[in-house]
Regions:
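Thiamine diphosphate
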Residues: 1-53, 57-283, 287-290, 361, 368, ...
Length: 434
């Protein structure tokens, strides 16, 4: 009923007469002569290569190996009894082990109505999470002491807390330790549980080694990072992520989502739950974002392809492309409407996931971002690093080139150029360049 901690007092380079207990045994090969002397020291044949002594082989085959087989057979017998007595629960467990989703897992996902005031990405995600989790019993998680702020607490009846002596709850209290949280989630995922863990985006660096290992192991861990930009406002540059999006996007095999409104959050979660061999980072705003009118603009299910044309020229032949993710998409939509009123044909491309977009066919990518249209502006309240591959070197990239500042969001957006007028001016400059 308790974890087992195994402590092995060891000697690095054990048996090597000249290198045991030295850094040389750690950072470089022993060398042919030291290997020969080590074998002599251990009483092994000096010339044999890749030798496994008979006693060692017997210990593993007849000792450890036999014990493992006996334990597995006993466990399988117990599981057969469990399956007979609780067939539905056993079926759920087998589905979990196969990384399958229960039928109807997304039946409670509903679209959000258009709303100019909208809601924060974190708030929308909390609602979606609580719509999915009751239908996926092995979806469990928590936050690094920030559940109320990240909106990641499961609040439906029976969710409960995972505590010492009470292991049925589904809310984990990881404490203020992002790296430990990420490591715990990796362990849970390797047992086929579907874990999520949340924190402020600025603190993602603390968990980065665990995130990287999840990507190496190809396990579907879900990281929820909120307070995603200078939108944090008065908390200032220590809490305003700048380089963090670029850093996560640089990790191979990690899928990064930064949705633009509540309905993109819904569709991001729909995709996330169906990714069974990749970790995902879901990047969410603190501030409210307008919930776009999907009768007027493109459906949010374009999220599944990583990027899509959200608003377009009436003839489908834009003169300039406005590319953005997350909270800046609605700014681009407003700029699009202003350009439209001036007779300038623009297209707004919402790019919630670069990784998914780059997995699409070349035809699809070209249909969203036509190669012949070189007047391009990207907008993201973060480092512009990486955007050049979508804008081209001649395109304009509106982003953060310094750390942030402590002020209300509107003042910060004006200071750093994240305004409708600034985007419109950039679009005009691009068209003049043409």
């Amino acid at each position: 009923d308790k974890p087992t901690l195994i402590i092995v007092d060891s000697h690095i380079g054990y048996g090597a007469p000249n290198k045991q207990d030295t850094s040389a045994a750690h950072g470089e090969p022993l060398g042919a002569e030291e290997i020969r002397l080590t074998k002599r020291n251990l009483g092994w044949p000096e010339d044999a290569k890749f030798l496994v002594p008979d006693g060692v082989r017997e210990h593993f085959e007849q000792g450890v190996g036999a014990h493992g087989r006996e334990e597995r057979e006993a466990w399988m017998a117990k599981f057969d009894e469990y399956k007979s007595e609780y067939p539905e629960l056993a079926d759920q467990m087998l589905k979990m082990q196969r990384r399958e989703l229960p039928e109807g897992w997304d039946k409670d996902l509903k679209p959000f109505p258009p709303d100019a005031k909208g809601m924060g990405g974190r708030e929308a995600s909390g609602k979606v999470l609580n719509a999915i989790a009751p239908n996926v019993p092995w979806l469990i998680g928590g936050a690094a002491d920030l559940a109320p702020s990240t909106k990641t607490r499961l609040t439906f009846e029976g969710a409960g807390d995972f505590l010492a002596g009470s292991y049925g709850g589904r809310n984990f209290h990881f404490g203020v330790r992002e790296h430990a949280m990420g490591s715990i989630m990796n362990g849970l995922s390797l047992s086929k549980v579907r874990p999520y863990g949340a924190g402020f985006f600025i603190f993602s660096d603390y968990g980065r080694p665990a995130i990287r290992l999840a990507a190496i192991m190809e396990i579907p861990v879900i990281y929820i990072f909120t307070h995603d930009s200078i939108g944090v406002g008065e908390d200032g540059p220590t809490h305003q992520p700048i380089e963090h999006l670029a850093a996560l996007r640089a990790i191979p095999h990690l899928i990064v989502f930064r949705p633009a409104d509540a309905n993109e959050v819904v569709e991001a979660w729909r995709v996330i739950m169906q990714l069974h061999h990749q970790p995902v980072a879901l990047i969410l705003s603190r501030q409210a974002l307008p919930t776009l009118d999907r009768a007027k603009y493109a459906p949010a299910d374009g999220v599944a392809k990583g990027a899509y044309a959200l608003a377009d020229a009436s003839d489908g032949k834009p003169e300039v492309l406005l590319l953005a993710s997350g909270s800046e998409v609605s700014l681009c939509v407003d700029a699009y409407e202003q350009l439209k009123s001036e007779g300038i044909k623009a297209r707004v491309v919402s790019m919630p996931s670069w990784e998914l977009f780059e997995q699409q066919s070349q035809d699809y990518r070209d249909s969203v971002r036509p190669p012949g249209i070189t007047a391009r502006v990207s907008v993201e309240q973060a480092s512009t690093f990486g955007w050049a591959r979508f804008t081209g070197l001649e395109g304009e990239r509106i982003g953060m080139k310094t750390f942030g500042a402590s002020a209300p969001l509107k003042e910060l957006q004006k200071k750093f150029g994240f305004t409708v007028d600034g985007i419109v001016a950039a679009a005009r400059r691009q068209l003049r360049r043409e």
